[in-house]
């Protein structure tokens, strides 16, 4: 069997009325030049009472345990099923199904050619847009048996509010998977299919997405298992690119979760989870950031702005490893730089409720609390995320500190929003200010620019000499810090 192929075995079990029990299904695979075989067991409940709507099992596995590498994702799930009059059907027809991956796993729709919405609807997508393969089983088959089906999965032009989109096919037509980054504290990659067909309801699906689609160029399934050639196909491309990348965090990972609702009970979701194998090799990930920080005025003892520019190289080479994700970044301003009381007196504050940390809700911070602008670049998006920096309410912020700020950056077309809290500490002996961003999202950030306003909205004023230090550190099994210093003399 080729990687991604599915072998389906159905076993009929006769159960006496009033009996509830369970059986264990066990499977073992060997060969393929593997050093050792692999085994798995799955316990299935057997009952004379029909199952209610739900997902009986979920599996999400990766092709490599190397952190930050190009990996294939294979995920499979089965809806609870009933047999009536010899016909297999789901306990209820699924309406929406969504898969959330652990933080740090990312897909880059910009790295692969896209299929137009029209071509996707008519099943005429070019091979270059293929990024995976799906094997499905649906109801209403011949003689009441489930209908097996196989299809390539295509990278599709997204709609407004989507990071990306994928299209696969059932006998009755296409299914669209919407890709997005959840606007919560973990910023997980989410794949969701809405309004699934009820004419031929979905029973099960096994989906494989390729880390490097060009590596799977071949015949592949064309709505039927291929009789010759590889078990599945892929795009041909002159320069292979990375579509799917594993997280840059080592050790135990959060579970992948799948939620689903039904047409008979919409918005009533069931949820199952699947543990993911731990990743390793974080110390191998490259991390070579550069940063510059400078005031934007040349007059001392005046409310000043600051320009912070952070850049992290991001390689799309599928044979290499991705850069480690930025975890923390801090900037320590020079001695003598203090809070500009004249400017701060005219500012308002943004509350935790106004900013809505960990929520996709719209930001309602007062305009008078805005103290700067922000821009974030990522290879996942064609356009940067842009937004504002707000002064947080003193002592009523995530740090309970007198000084803090909120950073909000959005890309509305892709539906991506990032909200961060930044701590501002004043050294009790020297008065030096340190601005720190902690636990940044596990996303590939290639650039981060912060501009703190000067003038009436400025929150800092300078002495005659400026010496700025800043450090940033990587995530992973071993933390690695980079520290830089810069100097600038102002007119007094």
List where the protein language model places each region:
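Ser/Thr/Pro/Gly-rich, low-complexity intrinsically disordered stalk/linker tracts of secreted
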Residues: 5-492
């Amino acid at each position: 069997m080729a990687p991604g192929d599915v072998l389906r075995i159905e076993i009929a079990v006769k159960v006496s009325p009033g009996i509830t029990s369970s059986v264990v299904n066990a499977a073992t695979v060997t060969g393929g030049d593997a050093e050792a075989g692999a085994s798995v067991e799955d316990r299935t409940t057997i009952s004379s009472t029909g199952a209610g709507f739900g997902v009986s099992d979920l599996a999400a596995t990766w092709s490599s345990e190397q952190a930050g590498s190009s990996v294939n994702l294979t995920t499979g799930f089965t809806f609870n099923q009933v047999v009536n009059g010899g016909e297999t059907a789901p306990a209820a027809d699924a309406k929406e199904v969504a898969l959330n991956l652990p933080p740090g796993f990312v897909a880059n729709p910009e790295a692969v050619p896209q299929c137009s919405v029209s071509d996707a609807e008519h099943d005429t997508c070019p091979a270059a847009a293929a990024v995976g393969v799906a094997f499905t089983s649906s109801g209403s088959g011949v003689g009441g048996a489930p209908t097996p089906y196989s299809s390539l999965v295509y990278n599709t032009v997204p709609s407004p509010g989507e990071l990306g989109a994928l299209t696969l096919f059932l006998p009755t037509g296409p299914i669209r998977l919407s890709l997005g980054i959840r606007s919560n504290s973990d910023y997980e990659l989410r794949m969701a299919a809405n309004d699934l067909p009820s004419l031929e309801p979905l029973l099960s699906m096994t989906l494989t997405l390729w880390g490097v689609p060009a590596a799977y160029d071949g015949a592949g399934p064309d709505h039927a298992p291929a009789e010759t050639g590889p078990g599945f196909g892929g795009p041909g491309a002159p320069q292979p690119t990375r579509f799917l990348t594993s997280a840059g965090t080592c050790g135990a990972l959060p579970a992948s979760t799948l939620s689903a609702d039904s047409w008979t009970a919409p918005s009533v979701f069931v949820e199952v989870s699947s543990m993911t194998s731990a990743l390793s090799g974080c110390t191998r990930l490259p991390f070579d950031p550069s940063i510059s920080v400078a005031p934007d005025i040349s007059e001392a003892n005046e409310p000043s702005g600051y320009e912070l520019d952070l850049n992290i190289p991001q390689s799309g080479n599928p044979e290499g490893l991705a850069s480690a994700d930025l975890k923390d970044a801090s900037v320590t301003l020079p001695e003598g730089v203090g809070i500009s009381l004249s400017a701060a007196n005219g500012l308002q504050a943004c509350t935790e409720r106004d900013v809505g940390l960990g929520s996709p809700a719209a930001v309602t911070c007062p305009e008078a609390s805005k103290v700067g602008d922000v821009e974030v670049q990522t290879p996942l998006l064609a356009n940067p995320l842009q937004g504002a920096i707000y002064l947080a309410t003193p002592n009523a912020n995530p740090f309970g500190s007198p000084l803090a700020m909120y950073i909000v950056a959005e890309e509305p077309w892709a539906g991506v929003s990032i909200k961060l809290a930044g701590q501002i500490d004043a050294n009790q002996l020297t008065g030096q200010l340190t601005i720190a961003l902690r636990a940044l999202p596990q996303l590939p950030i290639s650039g981060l620019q912060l501009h703190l306003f000067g003038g009436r909205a400025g929150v800092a004023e300078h002495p005659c000499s400026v010496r700025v230090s800043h450090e940033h550190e990587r995530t992973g099994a071993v933390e690695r810090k980079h520290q830089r210093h810069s100097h600038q003399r102002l007119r007094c």
